[in-house]
Amino acid sequence: MGVKTFQFPFAEQLEKVAEQFPTFQILNEEGEVVNEEAMPELSDEQLKELMRRMVYTRILDQRSISLNRQGRLGFYAPTAGQEASQIASHFALEKEDFILPGYRDVPQIIWHGLPLYQAFLFSRGHFHGNQIPEGVNVLPPQIIIGAQYIQAAGVALGLKMRGKKAVAITYTGDGGTSQGDFYEGINFAGAFKAPAIFVVQNNRFAISTPVEKQTVAKTLAQKAVAAGIPGIQVDGMDPLAVYAAVKAARERAINGEGPTLIETLCFRYGPHTMSGDDPTRYRSKELENEWAKKDPLVRFRKFLEAKGLWSEEEENNVIEQAKEEIKEAIKKADETPKQKVTDLISIMFEELPFNLKEQYEIYKEKESK
């Protein structure tokens, strides 16, 4: 007698999940509006300011790479190619919102108020680079991949408990979604309806590991399903799409509707970091050329020029401003006194415990000689 075997619809279930996360786009690669209904309400001046910040950030990246090669900066993770994901997402925030960045997300915290020279000091490992000025709602860049997701969930819950109309936004890359902290963070925020925005900048490679070898999920946005929170996949080279998605997520959050996971499809044009990574060993020239055609600055420039809002002269002005301010910032970083062991001890507590007081005195005597 034959036994009838029930066929569970496993494959169909997965297909249905992935189908719920099509890529959200407003501007195509030619800078043309393909989703008029989703166009955000931004004035002409706001559109120009967004472009200024993206151009400035590209120049900052180029100069930071040069300074690193000269030995004037330490650790640095290039950002070119991710300006729409980073700058347009920040553009949707308010001053009272908190940013919990990863190590590639220094541009967002600079635009949120961290002085540029302190960002350079952070790169050098100077303690003052992590001393955030009063009123600037950012945390120092997180080096441990994914850990910022747990911290963002906690900050967001704190904002909720205090009745603040503000959000905590955090960023990681595609590799970060393979970390346990990622799942703990989105699950915790979902369970407590914490006002958090989780941005996954899917730049296709976790250092050298392609996203296809990190997960069999067809999108990273669908990882939100397990936590029971909304998720969306966005064209991360389209600044208007990124802005619109983050703006909507922020509105949800401050209205008590909980967190959102946003996957931005983007590409880093440079190496993972300046610490010896060679992307030509794991990326083809064809792939790099394909993503170069999607450049967020080129795309947005075409859009603004078609509206008569941007010119070569205006862009050159931003470039010169950026170069001058970077020059001043690195000079200020150079003039900052070198850190001493006593500096590192003294900033740990408001009042030092006895064992650190003892160590402080020992090093103070050594440093005075």
From Swiss-Prot:
Q: Summarize subunit and interaction data from the UniProt record for this chain.
A: Heterodimer of an alpha and a beta chain.
Q: Which organism is it from?
A: Geobacillus stearothermophilus (Bacillus stearothermophilus)
What this protein is reported to do is described as:
The pyruvate dehydrogenase complex catalyzes the overall conversion of pyruvate to acetyl-CoA and CO(2). It contains multiple copies of three enzymatic components: pyruvate dehydrogenase (E1), dihydrolipoamide acetyltransferase (E2) and lipoamide dehydrogenase (E3).
Please provide an example of a Pfam family that matches this protein in its UniProt record: E1_dh
Looking up InterPro entries in the UniProt record yields: Alpha-ketoacid_DH_E1_comp, DH_E1, PdhA/BkdA, THDP-binding
Tell me its EC number(s), please.
1.2.4.1
Q: Which gene encodes it?
A: pdhA
This chain belongs to the protein called Pyruvate dehydrogenase E1 component subunit alpha
**Keywords for this protein:** Oxidoreductase, Pyruvate, Thiamine pyrophosphate
Which reaction equations make up its catalytic activity? N(6)-[(R)-lipoyl]-L-lysyl-[protein] + pyruvate + H(+) = N(6)-[(R)-S(8)-acetyldihydrolipoyl]-L-lysyl-[protein] + CO2
Give the GO biological process terms: branched-chain amino acid catabolic process
Could you say which residues form the signal peptide? none
Q: Which cofactor does it need?
A: thiamine diphosphate
Q: Name one GO molecular function term.
A: pyruvate dehydrogenase (acetyl-transferring) activity
Q: Which domain of life is it from?
A: Bacteria
